[in-house]
Amino acid sequence: MHSSALLCCLVFLTGVRASPGQGTQSENSCTHFPGSLPHMLRELRVAFSRVKTFFQKKDQLDSMLLKESLLEDFKGYLGCQALSEMIQFYLEEVMPQAENHDPDIKEHVNSLGEKLKTFRLRLRRCHRFLPCENKSKAVVQVKNAVSKLQEKGIYKAMSEFDIFIDYIEAYMTMKAQN
């Protein structure tokens, strides 16, 4: 089934590239996407550095939330799905709750969220994700752990955001090399 999905995706992408009049400005900006990736990741890291200490001090748990299995999912055939799910998870579940923990960090968490939204928008505009039918087991484990831990889970998820950025970088580097 995986090869048939890949074949459908390739046929679709070939048709998109062959369509006349599709040479838009966004398509042209996508040719520069791999070169702008380090800058976008640096922006995420700088934005996270403004809240990192706050959340890591509040994180009283010894266990890791973002485990090696998530990185392996990012590097595997479900990489597109795992990345998409994790971005959505941080934007819809973690960051909205994290903003409410302290008025002094709300603006910085919001800024980090906006940068992550911009990153997601550029990914969607410039890269077609392969259709993934299965959910990433590692992402499901992260979501379940955060849900179980409640408030402590938000601190944990935010304190490990830099690991998430590293996993994004590993995924994007792998995709750029293929």
Swiss-Prot record:
Q: Which residues are glycosylated?
A: 134
> Any S-S bridges, and between which cysteines?
30-126, 80-132
Which processes are annotated in GO (biological process)? branching involved in labyrinthine layer morphogenesis; cellular response to hepatocyte growth factor stimulus; cellular response to lipopolysaccharide; chronic inflammatory response to antigenic stimulus; defense response to bacterium; defense response to protozoan; interleukin-10-mediated signaling pathway; negative regulation of autophagy
Q: Where in the cell is it found?
A: Secreted
Q: Does the keyword Signal apply?
A: yes
Listed A to Z, the keywords are:
Cytokine, Disulfide bond, Glycoprotein, Secreted, Signal
Coiled-coil region: none
Q: What molecular function terms (GO) are annotated for this protein?
A: cytokine activity; protein dimerization activity
InterPro entries (alphabetical): 4_helix_cytokine-like_core (IPR009079), IL-10 (IPR000098), IL-10/19/20/24/26 (IPR020443), IL-10_CS (IPR020423)
What's this protein's family per the entry?
A: Belongs to the IL-10 family.
The subunit structure is: Homodimer. Interacts with IL10RA and IL10RB.
- Protein name per its UniProtKB record: Interleukin-10
